[in-house]
A protein has these predicted regions:
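N-terminal pro-sequences and low-complexity stem/linker regions of secreted or lumenal proteins
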Residues: 27-28, 32-333
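Secretory targeting signatures
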Residues: 1-39
Length: 333
């Protein structure tokens, strides 16, 4: 009887606490912090909460230019270790790479969207003219808030901010994530330009803080072989390495998704990934030479890394629960 009375007393105490605190929570007098959803989203090991900000600042100090170069539809084993990709393997051996890097969806567009926004807002490859522009934030908003510059460079795009395909193997609009957001409705659209502008900006020393580079469907290995894409990279990447800008640059060579070649992934929930295991190579004087990380990373980690490199903050999506890929960076002496 005494035990039952004590248990009832505790139930009464708990009930009183709930009755008192619930109105206070509702009116914002008591703040309740959300539980970190990294575990439920299957990305516990990538939790950004473990990253020390001062360590980030020190590691990425000196990087003023970040370039993302997106290739197409090839899985990790098709490129890394393959005799069809001698140049990419040369880069991986000289700089830093990831052996467990994954796309987030088995179609192109969601992966491109995720790289610049932290979320695959569209799960099918659609033309932007068929949908209203997305009003969600992207890395462009973060860059603007810091008065930093950006451009999207697209090979064979017929003109600035072009919204339709230009031939089967030329410029493909769903490889251009910027035009799916409200960026296309204002003067920011002028920053979506032909690849020739990249060569000019690089030569003039006027490369923006953030560059997003997409080759044509012939040169990105989508409608061609791994060897064809590797040959194009062997002519493009040296221009960057041999430029005066390279000393303050981080270039990421990455593929969008593995398509039928590799459908592997990991995790569950909102930010699950199933876009296949992909090559990712960091080409930079800041890269840890010859290093291969075995940590599991995704396009969300890539976005998180860009944000950390440029001191941008985050977008509150997949980037927020995904740590920067600091292990690819060499330690400051």
């Amino acid at each position: 009887m005494e035990y039952s009375f004590q248990k009832m007393r505790w139930f009464l105490v708990i009930a009183i606490i709930i009755l008192i605190t619930e109105p206070l929570i509702s009116f914002g007098i008591i703040e309740v912090k959300a539980v970190d959803n990294a575990k439920t989203d299957g990305l516990t090991s990538n939790s950004r909460a473990t990253t020390n900000q001062s360590s980030l600042n020190s590691t990425f100090d000196g990087i003023n230019h970040v370039i993302i170069l997106v290739m197409e539809n090839k899985g990790y084993p098709q490129v890394i270790g393959s005799s069809d990709a001698p140049y990419q393997n040369e880069l991986a051996k000289k700089y830093a790479s990831a052996s467990k890097y994954y796309g987030v969806f088995p179609e192109s567009l969601p992966n491109y969207l995720s790289i610049i926004s932290g979320y695959p807002y569209l799960t099918k490859d659609k033309d932007p003219g068929t949908i209203a522009p997305l009003k969600e934030q992207t890395i462009v908003n973060l860059l603007q808030s810091k008065n930093m510059t950006w451009k999207g460079y697209f090979e064979d795009i017929p003109g600035v901010c072009h919204l339709t395909d230009a031939g089967k193997s030329g410029y493909i609009v769903h490889h251009n994530p910027f035009v799916y957001f409200d960026i296309r409705t204002d003067d920011r659209c002028k920053n979506i330009v032909p690849l020739d502008d990249f060569y000019r900006d690089l030569g003039n020393g006027t490369l923006p803080n953030f560059s997003f580079v997409v080759p044509s469907n012939i040169h990105n290995s989508h409608d061609s072989t791994v060897a064809d894409g590797d040959k194009w990279l062997s002519s493009f990447v040296p221009r960057i390495i041999n430029s005066s800008t390279f000393n303050s640059t981080a270039l990421f060579v990455v593929y969008d998704e593995g398509q039928k070649h590799d459908k592997s992934g990991f995790g569950s929930g909102t930010y699950a990934v199933n876009g296949g295991r992909l090559p990712l190579i960091l080409v930079s004087p800041f890269a840890k030479a010859g290093f291969v990380t075995t940590n599991e990373y995704t396009h969300y980690n890539l976005l998180s890394t860009i944000e950390a490199m440029l001191g941008l903050g985050n977008l509150g999506k997949g980037d927020t629960i995904s740590q920067p890929m600091m292990d690819l960076m060499r330690s400051k002496s």
